[in-house]
């Protein structure tokens, strides 16, 4: 019927039994169907969704509506373009349980700590994968190299142990302090102790290099870029702490003890206890100077922000005094204050550096 109507509406005047009329405009319009579905062949139109098919024919401006039940929906056939079938089909979404995909919640995906512990594959460098046995073998080799380097440094320091002892005695030697050997072999074991500390200090760069070389393949590209400043800053701060302890902290503490005993007793110190005091003070000060490095690591992971670090400055003051009392082997308040001051300054400097990084 649709084809016949179309032929009648487009036929020339005088054909099909309809004489030409110039004053009355009566024509049979094209059959309109709602909804209109394209069909490659003149087949009966049908709607897939809905119960009825409503058609309307207009003749001379007067509309007649016919209603007939729609036949059962046929199976969908692919049209030449394939767009109609794809538009009618609604893809079924994948079920989401508790707002998570694969057991990972959105909060975990947005957490900087989670991203630090479990980086995505795109951030990982293209390194060679190794089995657990290969890792253990590599760890064994690097430990062997570190022990060999420290052992060689200890032997070298032992060869010049007397010169090292004279250098460490310099802070109090000008004040007339005399060192005694109170037991047989005390000086020998003291030289071994001094050589061990100095050898560990000289071999620490090799140990640090081996640690970095072992953990570097497991780091992402961004973490590798961040590793260089951290290692360099940690090394500089460690040696700066040792230098500060040798030039400022140790002389101040030793002079306090000498002046306090002046006029009452003669200063005759055990060489073993003296070097125990000095070496522990040097290394504890170097370790305490690592506070800014720890702050940068915590800031990069996202655990603590710079504003949070600055908001607890009152507790930091108390903590610096307590840490100075624990780290210094002496019990005098002067040494504790001399160490607590730099610790507080390092903490504030570390918070400022974290703020510069945008954390």
Curated annotation (Swiss-Prot):
> What is the membrane topology noted in the UniProt record heading this document?
Multi-pass membrane protein
Inactivation phenotype = Pale green phenotype. Mutant plants have low levels of chlorophyll, show quick water loss and fail to accumulate ABA under drought.
Subcellular location per UniProt equals: Plastid, Chloroplast thylakoid membrane
Give TM segment ranges: 143-163, 199-219, 226-246, 277-297, 309-329, 334-354
Disordered as annotated region, ranges: 1-23, 59-104
Q: Give the molecular function GO annotations.
A: proton motive force dependent protein transmembrane transporter activity
Tissue spec. comment: Expressed in leaves and shoots.
Q: How does it assemble?
A: In thylakoid membranes, TATC and TATB form a large receptor complex, containing about eight TATC-TATB pairs, which binds the precursor protein. Twin arginine signal peptide promotes pH-triggered docking of TATA oligomers to TATC-TATB receptor complex, inducing a conformational switch of TATA that results in activation of the translocase. TATA dissociates from TATC-TATB upon completion of translocation.
For this protein, the record's HAMAP family field holds: TatC
From the Swiss-Prot or TrEMBL record, give the protein name.
Answer: Sec-independent protein translocase protein TATC, chloroplastic
Which gene holds the coding sequence for this protein?
Answer: TATC
